[in-house]
């Protein structure tokens, strides 16, 4: 399933998505990820985190490590993958996001769009079952947005389970099975993209769409 979470700033979108791998702690209710309940049990948290990849608004790459080292760090330390195997996997995913030639460079030598594609490749190196994207294009120059969205569309077409917080409504229309609209910490409306965009039920959703699609 590919879910897009939309809503105005401060509506709780990023907090919701960060709860799914315990970067934020939920106060009530249950979060169950692939059959494992996210509780205060550290074993459960580690298990879920190892299966949930996350790509942030700001790329969060280690500036003192090469692109290849950024991609192999977690598999080597967390999954205990042999270095050679980790490097082969990293090159596979760097090719997938179309920047294998950048492997030996440092993050500061890459454009924002390239760094975000590295961040996606780095997450994929852990072979996650679910990918979380927290406004992955909002810090990018307009001409770099397409290259990141193209990578995400390709992932979606290959069947990756994805939750994506984004204002890119064209991406939501093209890729999502379901669009969730949040406001003031609540899910106001959720529906299939066609129904969500063409026939929104809530007045708050209608206002949001008129503002974001009117530009």
What is each residue range found by the language model?
Residues 1-193:
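ABC family nucleotide-binding domain
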Residues 190, 194-215:
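C-terminal boundary and immediately downstream tail of ABC-type ATPase nucleotide-binding domains
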């Amino acid at each position: 399933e590919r879910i897009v979470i939309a809503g105005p700033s401060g509506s709780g979108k990023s907090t919701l998505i960060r709860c799914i791998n315990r970067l934020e702690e939920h106060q009530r209710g249950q979060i169950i990820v692939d059959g494992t309940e996210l509780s205060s049990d550290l074993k459960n948290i580690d298990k879920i985190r190892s299966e949930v990849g996350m790509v942030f608004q700001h790329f969060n790459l280690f500036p003192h490590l090469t692109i290849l080292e950024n991609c192999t760090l977690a598999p080597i330390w967390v999954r205990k993958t042999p270095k050679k195997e980790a490097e082969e996997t990293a090159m596979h995913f760097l090719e997938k996001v179309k920047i294998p030639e950048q492997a030996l460079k440092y993050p500061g030598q890459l454009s924002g769009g390239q760094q975000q594609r590295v961040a996606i490749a780095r997450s994929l190196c852990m072979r996650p079952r679910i990918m979380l994207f927290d406004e992955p294009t909002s810090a990018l120059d307009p001409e770099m947005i397409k290259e990141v969205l193209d990578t995400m569309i390709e992932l979606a077409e290959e069947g990756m389970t994805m939750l994506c917080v984004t204002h890119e409504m064209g991406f939501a229309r093209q890729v999502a099975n379901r669009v969730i609209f949040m406001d003031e910490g609540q899910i106001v409306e959720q529906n299939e993209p066609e129904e969500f965009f063409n026939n929104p039920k809530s007045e708050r959703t209608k206002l949001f769409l008129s503002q974001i699609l009117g530009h």
